[in-house]
Amino acid sequence: MPTAAAAATASLRVSNIPPSAVAAELLAFFDSAVAVAGGAFACEIAAAHRGWLSRGHGTVQFGSAAAAAAAAGLASSGRLPRFLGALLSVSPSPVDLLPRASDLSLRAAGAGLVVGDRVAERVFEAADAWDGVRAEVIPGKRRVDLYLEHDSQRYKLEVLFEDMKDCLGCTLDGMGAILLQLNYAPRIHTAISGPAVNSRFMDDRFHACKEDAKFSWVRALDFTPNYSFGRCSTLVLKLGKSALVSDILKSLPFSGNLGELTMNSMDGVGASSNVVPLVHCPRDYSVPYEVLFRLNSLMHMGKIVAKHVNADLFKALQELPVDVSRRIFEKMHKLESTCYGPLQFIQQEAYSMKRSHNVLLSNEGEGEGERKLMKCYRVNITPSKIFCFGPEEEVTNYVVKHHSAYASDFVRVTFVDEDWSKLSSNAISARIEQGFFSKPFKTGLYYRILSILKKGFSIGPKNFEFLAFSASQLRGNSVWMFASNASLNAGGIRRWMGHFENIRSVSKCAARMGQLFSSSRQTFEVLRWDVEVIPDIEITTDGSKYIFSDGIGKISLRFAKRVAHHVGLDPTNLPSAFQIRYGGYKGVIAIDPMSSIDLSLRPSMKKFESESRMLNITSWSKSQPCYVNREIISLLSTLGIRDEIFVAMQQDEMRETEEMLTNKEVALSVLGKLGGSETKTAVKMLLQGYEPSSEPYLSMILKAHQENRLTDIRTRCKIHVPKGRVLIGCLDETGVLEYGQVYIRITKNSKEQKDSNQSYFYNDDGKTATVVGKVAITKNPCLHPGDIRVLEAIYDPDLVGMVDCLVFPQRGERPHPNECSGGDLDGDLYFITWDDKLIPEKVDTPMDYTATRPRIMDHVVTLEEIQKHFVDYMINDSLGAISTAHLIHADRSPLKARSPECLQLATLHSMAVDFAKTGAPAEMPRTLRPREYPDFMERWEKPMYISNGVLGKLYRSAMGHMEKSGDSGALSSSSAQPSPTYDPDLEVPGSDEFLQAAEEYYELYEEKLTTLMNYYRAELEDEILTGNIRNKMLYLKRDNKRYFEMKDRIVAAVDALHREARGWLLSSRKEEDASRMASAWYRVTYHPDRRRGKRFWSFPWIACDNLLAIKASSQLRRRRQKDDDSTAVVQMDCSA
């Protein structure tokens, strides 16, 4: 829900305007009619494009909200004069024609602006300054606009309220001023004018404005000679009048009054590069790269100021071990305000650590699990700044793993907007010219990104240059870069990856280069003679060639067992298929029990030539829970599934979510659908006999998942389908399946194992069963009604070994995977349900997903062409906009997803998906762009309508259920520390001697977990354990993809910490002492005599298996004692 009501605008909608009227006349009419300060400011009359005729209505913007209210008052009271003989009708307008402060007291002309750094509490160093600045505070848009001139060019700076770290009133040389300490640089725009520029307020009969508005604002780079906006983080706005300062501060997120501010000029030379701010180690000193990188990160996060990063600081750091510097920096990251004395802080912390032996514990247990995790350095580059992050835990990829000796020379670079949100295409390439042959205007951001890709950038001694990008990185505007050295350079890595010279399509060549950067686990090198190439299964229908075996091969049973054991799977419970990367091959390999060859690969799996023989596993077949989402619900509704069915499913889901806090069986059922190590611990605790609300750690985890689940239901319509799965697609190698048939054998969940009334299961062995009957199948994303296929699931004994995968036939006019959103068998996951209520009686003809042929070059693709393709993708990436528009048109049209608009958008979406490989962009026409957004999208900043479709009904049903339950999306109980009940069953004899060590380990764990919480901005323990951050940063709220990527990093970091802690448990101790240490961990965390304030309940449960073994032993001992007592009573009765 919106946090506050939107501020009133200064505009009115005006109707009944005479057809002959021009905007200048209407503007003058209202300006004379309204005798309030500000008068009328701008006017626009709506016009039909054909014939350029007036539509008889328009918008008038006034100089202030008070003037607009006066005009509305005149109209409502009948005192507004007639305009050209017509009686005008007015109503409030939700938006202004031009963004301006609606209150005159929130405008300041002739102000001064200074950019620089706050180097002490009341000391400011100025880097650049301007006079004659106009400031406008716009509370409705929660931002401040600053207008200024520099070298005769007009600029506008936008500062969002959310970007302000501190907003302080102060005085400067006796004048009133406002100090804004920012987390990010302001968004910079420049004015572009000219005869061909398409300004909203050109000289024509339907537009008029009192000020010069015949120009367009486009995004620009830092225009100062020394990149002051990039290097610095503080603005000072000099206003003069104390009354004006007071009025403006009332509308800003005011932090307090600073008093008199001392201003000095900034010393030192300007930046040598436009990638700022970065500090470098002086020549006379030397610190490890990790220390320098973390030091830059502290500066970028506003914890220290560049001025204080001097030779004395580097001298102090040079004398410290890396792990000590790391821990000190982690403590600095926890500071809520800027540290103006970093040298003193470092010296004091180093002295404290020297006296404590805890520092010796910090590395114990590290290294475990290194096979699948790596330390990754990340960088965000914005239009003005650079931000350093990490190193962070991530699942490794083959390229970095193979070159692990140079792991710190790799960096993942993401190009983002100033506040880390996704850069809009209009920020990179703006359409400002009018005319049929007009070309987009490439802004400075386009050339900045291209320049960094071509020339690279430096951090300390490392000069990073472009390497490659994976498909997911391309979608996230991210690339890998590498710092070349005497032994290895980026070109050498690309040559090692494979031979790409024969790929003459720029987009395909770029995609193939990124293939080995997928997160994967390395297994074995498979030699040439252990690999065979088998033919693809193809058919040509109506001139189109289809490959039924597109992306799938085979693996022998013997070799599959070796692979499964290597990646930590149970060889007695083998997955039926693995998703792989092998040299230039990618796709899926399914187990063939009859094969004696390790790998049988097909030509459709081969993407390029490579000398690499390492088999990399990216995933494997598994039983995954099935959920409907907005897209699937929209299509099923189009195909005739009634709204009441979805509402009933949602209510069942929410009822189960409520009961998970009180019902053990329900809690186990819900956790069974989730992943993550913390759910495994919770499941073990429930199975051991703990009640959901009886134990603080267990209760905390359950409440966190309950809250996240309710949020998903409300915001994403994510509803569980019990009679369904999400499975990887495979091929029927036996040829027994006919067109229209599939084979589905699944691993049954605990609920299915207990339910004997399941007519849709056949050949049920208790653990697995084959689904038989009608099934509905699709693949996300799905926009066309024909993406939903209804097929017949059958049983065949020849396929009984294929478990937890969807087996498609190799017969027919067209492959079924291709009918589902243009899917294939190289790892695509498919939604399957055998719930009769969700299976349509009739389906639509599937869409033709034949991709556009990529443009073929007459030369070997160059690195420059790949880099340009990356930036062009940023400009043309329209997937999100198309998906959103499709949902809205389907919601509003009686034809739903069959409407012409939706069908056109489905075609565009297919083109947009293929753009990464074809290079052919999908441009959405303006006529398809939504003007209003439904309530279920919660886009409060946009014009909104109440949805009457199924998604609107589900949204309001969820909101009503939450309000009835006293929950509006954030469970208040989650923020409170649970009331712990100490469990004496977890005490063991001999644990007393471990209490002192346990206390020290707890303090170390607390320090490390708090560091992670601070780094990822998690306020509570359950947030960092589950990765479900409640108060997400604004850019994460807007970008689900990047939020889920961050969530993966959080989970990886917590898993790494828990592995390290398990190392503490076992380090230098006998195995039998582990139980006593685990008991001591529990006692120092839970015992009333040892609890001091806030506790991290997760600490002892890192040793979950040890504690539950103690619990089981205590329960068994108590039962035996009870049996002995009962026997004694019986014997006494008999003797009596």
Curated annotation (Swiss-Prot):
One of its GO terms (molecular function) is RNA binding. Residues 967-980 have a biased composition (Low complexity). Transmembrane segments: none annotated. InterPro entries: RNA-dep_RNA_pol_euk-typ. It catalyses: RNA(n) + a ribonucleoside 5'-triphosphate = RNA(n+1) + diphosphate. Belongs to the RdRP family. This is Probable RNA-dependent RNA polymerase 2.
